[in-house]
Swiss-Prot record:
Pfam families: ARD. HAMAP family: Salvage_MtnD. Its EC number is 1.13.11.54, 1.13.11.53. Monomer. The record marks E96 as: May play a role in metal incorporation in vivo. The lineage of its organism: Bacteria, Pseudomonadati, Pseudomonadota, Alphaproteobacteria, Hyphomicrobiales. This is Acireductone dioxygenase. Pathway: Amino-acid biosynthesis; L-methionine biosynthesis via salvage pathway; L-methionine from S-methyl-5-thio-alpha-D-ribose 1-phosphate: step 5/6. GO terms for molecular function: acireductone dioxygenase (Ni2+-requiring) activity; acireductone dioxygenase [iron(II)-requiring] activity; iron ion binding; nickel cation binding. GO terms for biological process: L-methionine salvage from methylthioadenosine; L-methionine salvage from S-adenosylmethionine. It catalyses: 1,2-dihydroxy-5-(methylsulfanyl)pent-1-en-3-one + O2 = 3-(methylsulfanyl)propanoate + CO + formate + 2 H(+); 1,2-dihydroxy-5-(methylsulfanyl)pent-1-en-3-one + O2 = 4-methylsulfanyl-2-oxobutanoate + formate + 2 H(+). Ni(2+) binds at H97, H99, E103, H141. SUPFAM superfamilies: RmlC-like cupins (SSF51182). It comes from Parvibaculum lavamentivorans (strain DS-1 / DSM 13023 / NCIMB 13966). Binds 1 Fe(2+) cation per monomer. Binds 1 nickel ion per monomer.
Length: 184
């Protein structure tokens, strides 16, 4: 279930907000310029569904998002627990970074956790199927796939280069709860 936990960025043991209420999540994230919406991801993906199949299944949604936001490129990231590169992928995304581009993600399968650092706080957003999140360019953040990742997200960009991260070198991600610690 979609879950927002807010911490002071200096104290991961102190919880300032903990909610699974979609409206409260959207309102809290809106306060830091992040768009969060619940959409419908009605298409079940086959085990072998590749980027082409995923984009074909969600073509109308992707086109609408790209037209509305002036986005130029799209791709799909799909990671399963048996992915041989899962550990290195996790480490790459766990490093705090920013982008020159908005980070727009529509989750169509599984779940993962965004950690957004803004105004002295860390916003941990566990996104799952049906969640759309748009993180503004320049927002300091990291993403945790979990130790046994299972998610598929459509990624939409204004830049034709796609995902380009600018790493901060800060080890803040090592101090906050990892995604696999998410209570069910």
């Amino acid at each position: 279930m979609t879950h927002l936990t807010v911490y002071p960025d200096t104290d991961p043991a102190t919880v300032l907000l903990d909610t699974r209420d979609g409206a409260e999540i959207a309102a809290s994230l809106s306060g830091i310029g992040v768009v969060f919406e619940r959409w419908d991801a009605p298409h079940a993906l086959g085990e072998d569904a590749d980027q082409t199949a995923v984009l074909a299944a969600y073509e109308a949604d992707v086109k609408r998002l790209m037209d509305e936001g002036g986005y130029k490129s799209v791709d799909v990231v799909r990671v399963k627990p048996d992915n041989p590169n899962r550990a290195e992928m996790r480490q790459k995304f766990l490093a705090e970074h920013t982008h020159d581009d908005d980070e727009v993600r529509f989750f169509v399968e599984g779940a993962g956790a965004f950690y957004l650092r803004k105004d002295g706080r860390v916003y941990r957003v566990v996104c799952e199927r049906n969640d759309l999140i748009s993180v503004p360019a320049g927002t300091t953040h990291w993403f945790d796939t979990g130790a046994a990742p299972h998610f598929c997200a459509i990624r939409i960009f204004t830049s034709p280069e796609g995902w380009v991260g600018h790493f901060t070198g800060d080890d803040i991600a090592t101090r906050f709860p990892k995604f696999e610690s998410e209570p069910q």
